[in-house]
Curated annotation (Swiss-Prot):
GO term, biological process aspect, one: dTTP biosynthetic process
Protein name: Thymidylate kinase
Catalytic activity: dTMP + ATP = dTDP + ADP
Main enzyme class: transferase
Function: Phosphorylation of dTMP to form dTDP in both de novo and salvage pathways of dTTP synthesis.
Keywords, comma-separated and alphabetical: ATP-binding, Kinase, Nucleotide biosynthesis, Nucleotide-binding, Transferase
Gene3D superfamilies: P-loop containing nucleotide triphosphate hydrolases
Protein family membership: Belongs to the thymidylate kinase family.
Organism lineage string: Bacteria, Pseudomonadati, Pseudomonadota, Alphaproteobacteria, Rickettsiales
Gene: tmk
Length: 206
């Protein structure tokens, strides 16, 4: 990714309390400072319609298939209304969570659910996958300690250490499954600035 002036799709992934949103924001601010056309967005959400769907998904207890379809419907709206137009205009799109989060959070709850998630995505938008995904690798024990310091929470935040470990293992599995796309940043013992510098190094050496 030597030329960041062209439209590229960058996603940040991982469990709760790992600093994804912080790193997404830091990269966004850095690219803006370099006069690079860039937008920052998130999932589930990113558009007015998708944000309404997010409220249901993160606070209500849905049936597993209903939760997956809710996430996919929100993503379709987000892709068509925001992500694709920005990429077509030559912007860098930074997204806090994308398809891999759906695979781990919703796919794990269904039989063969991870493959189902990626197959659904290919059906909806066969040509749109991230150019690079940063998996912020923070050990579950550390992550849950960070979440417990927050003032706000959703249904995923409060599910306990077994859930955190399951999600962590899923992202590790995906990083092995898609090694060309998913870059693991081991961040448990690093400051946010140190993580940010590693991310920049990966971007400019691709």
């Amino acid at each position: 990714m030597n030329n960041l002036k062209q439209g590229k799709f960058i996603t940040f992934e991982g469990g709760e309390g790992i600093g994804k949103s912080t790193q997404s924001q830091m990269l966004y601010e850095y690219l803006k400072s370099q006069n690079t056309p860039v937008i920052l967005t998130r999932e589930v959400g990113g558009t007015a319609v998708a944000e309404k769907m997010r409220e249901i998904l993160v606070h209500e207890e849905l049936l597993p298939m209903s939760e997956l379809l809710q996430a996919m419907a929100a993503r379709y709206d987000h892709m068509v209304r925001k992500i694709i137009p920005a990429l077509q205009d030559g912007h860098i799109v930074i997204c806090d969570r994308f398809i891999d989060s759906t695979a781990c959070y919703q796919g794990l709850e269904l039989e063969n659910g991870i493959d189902l998630v990626y197959n659904l995505h290919k059906t909806l938008m066969p040509s749109l996958m991230p150019d690079i995904t940063f998996f912020i690798d923070v050990e579950p024990d550390t992550a849950i300690e960070r979440v417990n310091l927050r003032n706000m929470s959703n249904k995923f935040d409060v599910r306990g250490i077994d859930f955190y470990k399951k999600i962590y293992d899923c992202f590790k599995e995906l990083s092995n499954r898609f090694p060309e796309r998913i870059k693991t940043i081991k961040a448990s013992d690093l400051s946010p600035l140190e993580v940010h510098e590693l991310i920049k190094k990966h971007l400019y050496t691709r």
